[in-house]
Structures are given as structure tokens and as C-alpha cells.
Amino acid sequence: MSGPGTAAVALLPAVLLALLAPWAGRGGAAAPTAPNGTLEAELERRWESLVALSLARLPVAAQPKEAAVQSGAGDYLLGIKRLRRLYCNVGIGFHLQALPDGRIGGAHADTRDSLLELSPVERGVVSIFGVASRFFVAMSSKGKLYGSPFFTDECTFKEILLPNNYNAYESYKYPGMFIALSKNGKTKKGNRVSPTMKVTHFLPRL
């Protein structure tokens, strides 16, 4: 039995034709396309190709279910991606960064490696992707942060808004473990910190 999601997918071609119809017959002019030279467009293409490759490597049981994708609950590719720097106000203040060698750390200044793309995986859960390094921020079962070249379930974090308007990022796979930076800008093990500690508080900045 087909549901609302199936009907919406079936109507998509008709909607696209209706949107393109006003451009037909104008001296053969092609329909306008979105600019391909923007940073956002390039990141979108790279990110989607990475995730598609990563999902292909996952076991079938770990891949998003068709029903979840149709309902929008698991289709994070359709969500809003945010380019941000995650600032932790400890020590002299540090931005979380994903380095080209796969390490995760902190940098006081705005660096190319501290520009991150936060993408929704499902409601309240995000992935954190290093724009320059092309590594996902991931956390192991021992609470160690590392850079993953592919998207896995260790790359998912629950984004929690705190009373001070900072965010805490809790491992979705390993609840109770949080992303944290020390006063020296080094990563701290996620199983040795809590959201009451300042080292886990991050402010998303442009």
C-alpha cells in the first residue's frame, strides 16, 4: 500500500515540469540553473558524494530505512547544512578543528581547518564535517575524538542547547560522552567530562 511519502515522490516530476513550463518556448532558452561556482554548491556536491560512498560501505542493517527516508525522519541530505566554527571558551578560547592528518584539536585563531559543516542526521542529531580536511569529527567507544574520512555511526552527535546559549555535543552512538577541549586546546576524552563542565560548551559562530 502506498503512503503519503510515495505519493509525494510520484508527484515530483509533475511539479518540476510545471515549474519549468514558463521557460519553454522563449526562443529555446534553457531553464535557469543555480550557480555552480559558489562555495555552498561545491560543498554540497562533495558532501553528498562522500555520504553516498560511506553509506554504500555500511552494512545493510545500518543503512537508512526506506520508510524513514520517505517520511523525512532519516533523510539528512534534505536538511539544512550550516557552515560554522565551534568556539569553546576555555583557556584563551579555542575553535574545534579537523586537521588534514585526521587529528581533532583546537585552534585559537580562525583557521581553514576550523570551518565546519554541521548537517542534520535526524531531529536533534548532526554530523560535523571539516570543510578543508574533508574529515568527519568522530568519537570512539573509549571517548577519543578522531577524524573519519567516511561517514559512520560514530560521526553522529546529539546537539544540546544549554541554558547559557552554548551547545553541547553528545555522541549519539555512545550516550554520556561529549566533545570537549582542554584549556590548552587539546581534546579531552568524552567519557571523562559532562555537560555541566565548561570544556563541553561550544558556541557556533560564522
Curated annotation (Swiss-Prot):
Residues 1-30 form the signal peptide. GO terms for cellular component: cytoplasm; extracellular region; extracellular space. One of its GO terms (biological process) is positive regulation of MAPK cascade. The keyword rRNA-binding does not apply. One of its GO terms (molecular function) is heparin binding. Keywords: Developmental protein, Differentiation, Growth factor, Heparin-binding, Mitogen, Proto-oncogene, Secreted, Signal. It holds the Pfam family FGF. It is found in: Secreted. Plays an important role in the regulation of embryonic development, cell proliferation, and cell differentiation. Required for normal limb and cardiac valve development during embryogenesis. May play a role in embryonic molar tooth bud development via inducing the expression of MSX1, MSX2 and MSX1-mediated expression of SDC1 in dental mesenchyme cells. Interacts with FGFR1, FGFR2, FGFR3 and FGFR4. Affinity between fibroblast growth factors (FGFs) and their receptors is increased by heparan sulfate glycosaminoglycans that function as coreceptors. Belongs to the heparin-binding growth factors family. This is Fibroblast growth factor 4.
